[in-house]
Structure formats: structure tokens, C-alpha cells
Amino acid sequence: MTLNKVFFSGGEEIRDLCIVGGGPTGIFAAFQCGMNNISCRIIESMTQLGGQLAALYPEKHIYDVAGFPEVPAAGLVESLWKQAERYNPDVVLGEAVTRYSKLDDGSFEITTTSGSVYHSRAVLLAAGLGAFTPRKLPQLNAIDHLEGHSVFYAVKNMQDFAGKKVVIIGGGDSALDWAVGLLPVAERVTLVHRMHEFQGHGKTARDVEEAKERGAIDVYLNTEVTAIDTSGENLTKVHLCKKNGTGFQVEADRLLVLIGFKSNLGPLADWDLELVDNALVVDSHMKTSVDGLYAAGDIAFYPGKLKIIQTGLSDAAMAVRHSLTYIRPGEKVKHTFSSVKMAREKKNAK
């Protein structure tokens, strides 16, 4: 499977739907386009498909996607692409969308950072939370030279932590997941959180507590990092301080900072679309305040929205389905069960 090269081959030919964002929501939207006989083009700013799953934690295991009791993030991306690629969607990688124009005939013109212009009859924004950068520890200055060697903000390869004394900063899902996930490879794992309790999922928090009780992990709550000791590009110690003022040190080879990300919608924020909490307001058909422009996944807001992968996939199916009424006005939208469509395709392929 090729997920890290441009295999766009459609030239400037107009497509029914332009999907902005190649994460799980965008990839599944491409599959749904195939199911509904809609031509589509994915435009992704990164050089690979998969969004945060591929870029930040490809080896992280995910447990809350229906039908997958446990699946590596990279494996989920592969499965989603295997579904979508049967319909040969056009894919453009390494180009970020900068602006859109709605033309007199109701179609859209999309411009990217490369200066390329793409045309579509409708647009689906599936760009997640937009551009994301990891939150860093403001009290640690001038550690850029350690990043990617001794200091990390994501786990892209577990071997980076194999046989190492790892200090993890954070108390959310990612911090808890990796505190447990790195136990099989790390020499020692220490989890540090500035609050008095974890903010992560209950089950994962219990897993951490169980690991602590059996002596497999050190946990320090109400504690913050104050400084680090280094030898060249190598981390040697992390200085910690409890809220009562007690300071102490722990030996460390790796510092893994997992305190969240800062998101930025970038040019999308200037598209004169209705926003709530840095997300685009959509109606029950996943349509934004602009006719023909839809949103799905984390970038979409509606009352009761739950920001998980499963919801994004549902959003994608809804958005693609309802985009048909804009792409082909007046045409009756018919639902075809996937089992029926696939059986028909297999029969026709013989």
C-alpha cells in the first residue's frame, strides 16, 4: 500500500467532491463516494494519508472502533485505505488548501499552497482540528537540540524507547496509554502529572494504577518538571517538584511530553464560515453555512458531538450522502446496501 507519495492522476478535471483532509474521516469519505458513484479527490497537507494516526502515533493501539477489539493506528489507516482504493480516488499529498471560491455555476475552485487549482462540484472539509503542534513545557528552555533524540512529543517508533528509562509527562489518554504501552520495551517508566488525578479514560487509569501496585511503574501526582540534566545530546536526569515544595530527581534517558496539542484551522478560519469552539457549525446533513460545502469529523460541530474516530466515520457517510442533493440536484437519492453493491461489482468483474 502506498500512502506517502502523490498518485494524483486526474489533472485539472472537475470532480464531484473535493475532500480536504486525508485522515480516517477523509479516507472513509472517499470510500463512501465510491459507494454512491461520486468522483472525488482527497487533498492532504501532509506527505502521507492517515492524519494524526499516521503522523503522531502509528504504533498506538486503538480500542474504541466498532469491529476492532484492538487495532494499531497504522493498521486502521491501512484498512480504511484498502476500502477506499477500490474506487481509485484521486489523491494529492503535501499540499495544504489555502482558499476556496464558489463560482457562478455553484461549483468550487480550491487553491493550495503549491499554487495548484482544483475544481469540484461540492467540498467536504475533513481536516480534523486543522494544523496541530504539540504543547511543550514552557519551563524547559533551549531543548530543541534534544527533540527527536532524548525529548519526544509522540511515539512514532517504540524502539526509540527500548531499554531506556522513560519519564512521561501528562495525565490524559495518550500519557496513560503510553505509560502502559511502553512497559514491555522500556527499562523503567515514570509517569508525572501536575494534577491530583488523571484525566484519561477510566480503564486506562486503572491499568496504570495496577501497574503501579505491582511495582512496574512509578507514578507522581501533584508534581511538575522543573529542569533536566543532560550530557551533550543525552538526557540524564529529570528534576521534579511536588506542590508542597519537595524537590527530587529521577534518572532518565527519554522524556516523553504528552500534554496535548495546539490546533490551528489556518486559512479555514478566514473562510467566513460559522464557527463554535474552533469547529465549523453544521446542520443535520453535515452542511456548513455555505451551500455545497460540508464538514465531517473533529472539524465539524453540532450539539452533542463526540470527537472520536467512530463519529468521524459516521459524519463522513452522512456528508457524502447528502452532498448528492447538491451535486445532482433533482436526482432521487437511492440507498444501496454495501453487500448488494459489492456482489454486483464482483459479478460484473467476471
From Swiss-Prot:
Signal peptide: none annotated. Keywords: FAD, Flavoprotein, NADP, Oxidoreductase. FAD binds at residues 25, 44, 52, 57, 97, 132, 298, 339. The keyword Flavoprotein applies. Pfam families: Pyr_redox_2. InterPro entries: FAD/NAD-bd_sf, FAD/NAD-binding_dom, Fd--NADP_Rdtase_type_2, Ferredoxin-NADP_redctase_2. It comes from the Bacteria. One of its GO terms (molecular function) is ferredoxin-NADP+ reductase activity. The keyword Disulfide bond does not apply. Its EC number is 1.18.1.2. It catalyses: 2 reduced [2Fe-2S]-[ferredoxin] + NADP(+) + H(+) = 2 oxidized [2Fe-2S]-[ferredoxin] + NADPH. Binds 1 FAD per subunit. Its cofactor is FAD. Belongs to the ferredoxin--NADP reductase type 2 family. Homodimer. This is Ferredoxin--NADP reductase. The lineage of its organism: Bacteria, Pseudomonadati, Chlorobiota, Chlorobiia, Chlorobiales.
